[in-house]
């Protein structure tokens, strides 16, 4: 079930032959555009906490369910699942909603999309927030292997065997992924309902085509993606945030910070991949100070 905060205005856009569903809080003098992670994941998990903490601070929240997820159209054509096409989709939404220059926040996959967008449409950006993301996928994959190794050599051997045999649904493999998720995706004992709402409606066709079968195995069409060298050309004022225990770890954030010419970095010491749930007070204070 794709739960929607009733305070959002729902806007339907006709994009080529498809429908895109956008959400606009309508309130606030400063607009923040959210790009959620995934890919293929509805925007609930990112939309709801930002609405809760920012609208009463005068910040208008706009986001949308990217093509292939949530209430937007879900075509079966896998050729649609490319980062370049999503860049043009984002630019279409910006134009249709007449948003002008964006304060653009990209979380996880949304960060990869935001980086790619900034390289083509930098003049359409006011500020850029890159959250729990990276600019170099091969480097990330090496870091994920390091996180996997912390489970112990026997567990790593087991995981590699199931990945080679294609038995990723085996209970022992799934148990290892669950441990990694609670260490590096969200460290809360109970995950909020808005996370479950997104996870329960995840379009795995998009996710598996672009990324892979889970958060710790990248075999999709993004596995070689690397924009670190090009990021030196991004001059937009940028905030980079990362959790100390993040699946996209601080080393990824540091590489981006070193590449960008106008960025600052904030590490949340008690967070993994979702500091807006894990350390909301510190996270939203940092975000508000940067936006305003």
Language-model region placement:
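N-terminal cap/lid segment of alpha/beta-hydrolase-fold proteins
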Residues: 2-19
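Conserved HGGG/HGGXW glycine-rich cap/lid loop of the alpha/beta-hydrolase fold
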Residues: 19-74, 79
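Active-site loop/oxyanion-hole signature of alpha/beta-hydrolase fold enzymes
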Residues: 63-109
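Conserved hydrolase catalytic core segment
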Residues: 100-143
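Flexible "cap/lid" loop of the alpha/beta hydrolase fold
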Residues: 127-167
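Alpha/beta-hydrolase
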Residues: 160-236
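Conserved loop-alpha-helix segment in the C-terminal half of the alpha/beta-hydrolase fold
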Residues: 221, 228-271
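Catalytic active-site module of serine/aspartate enzymes centered on a nucleophile-bearing elbow/loop
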Residues: 263-292
